[in-house]
Curated annotation (Swiss-Prot):
One of its GO terms (cellular component) is extracellular region. Keywords: Disulfide bond, Ion channel impairing toxin, Potassium channel impairing toxin, Secreted, Toxin. Pfam families: Toxin_6. The lineage of its organism: Eukaryota, Metazoa, Ecdysozoa, Arthropoda, Chelicerata. Belongs to the short scorpion toxin superfamily. Potassium channel inhibitor family. Alpha-KTx 08 subfamily. One of its GO terms (molecular function) is ion channel inhibitor activity. This is Potassium channel toxin alpha-KTx 8.4. It comes from Leiurus hebraeus (Hebrew deathstalker scorpion). Inhibits voltage-gated potassium channels. It comes from the Eukaryota.
Length: 29
């Protein structure tokens, strides 16, 4: 998942979007 799509991707998991080296990382809220 790209950084652009990260917020939507993570919100479905009720997680916080974070970017690491241009990769999407979801952190539990």
């Amino acid at each position: 998942v790209s950084c652009e799509d990260c917020p939507d991707h993570c919100s479905t998991q009720k997680a916080r979007a974070k970017c690491d080296n241009d990769k999407c990382v979801c952190e539990p809220k």
